[in-house]
Amino acid sequence: MKDTLFYKFIARPFVWFWFSLLYGCKVVGKENIPKNGRVVLAGNHTNNWDSLMLISVVPRQVHFLAKDALFKGFPGFFLRRVGGIPVNRKIHDKDALINAKKTLEMDLCIGIFPEGTINRTDDIIMPFKIGAVKMSHDTDSTIVPFIITGEYKLFRRNTRVEFFPGYKIKSDDLTKENEKLMKKISKELKKNK
């Protein structure tokens, strides 16, 4: 399935222009994102703008999992049109996981922040929930780790996103695989501090 017309011709160009003009973003490792097939982009969550910033730099449509509270009014309209998947974070939202897996089974790309929320702690990273690894494993998708560094400050141009080589989750020990993903992202964040 190709990018939706709304995404390709309206949402992505608008978001790209807005982010390029106001924030700028250095992108490293874009070649590590497969152009086709099932992909789970998994990385740290620093700010409310992270999803939109990734929409502006990833060369294919990204279907983000986002808290259901964001799916109201105009933001909700926009999120639905760009393929957003609402998640009720108060419960173990099986419907969100089912929708995300269906999206991957159509050979599309999912974006997820395994921390589950914006990291407002002093820790470099918060513990990961297992959803990204489980979805990747269950759908035989390539998981592509990424990090976001810098701050979204107007006209500062210090935001950076780096994508690392993707891999398939072959082991059934998902707890161990989740720790491996978390350690990889944590290690890269420490290098970039």
Regions found by a protein language model. Give the residues of each.
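Non-catalytic C-terminal accessory region of glycerolipid acyltransferases
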Residues: 1-2, 6, 97-193
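Membrane-anchoring hydrophobic helices of lipid-metabolizing enzymes
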Residues: 1-40, 75, 83-84, 98, ...
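Catalytic core of membrane glycerolipid acyltransferases/transacylases, capturing the structured
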Residues: 11, 35-91
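A generic structural signal for well-ordered alpha-helical segments
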Residues: 18-20, 57, 79, 103, ...
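A generic structural signal for alpha->beta connector loops
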Residues: 22-24, 61, 81, 107, ...
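A generic local structural motif
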Residues: 25-30, 49-51, 71, 97-98, ...
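Generic preference for hydrophobic
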Residues: 27, 41, 64-65, 84, ...
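Helix-adjacent hinge/juxtasegments
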Residues: 76-78, 84-111
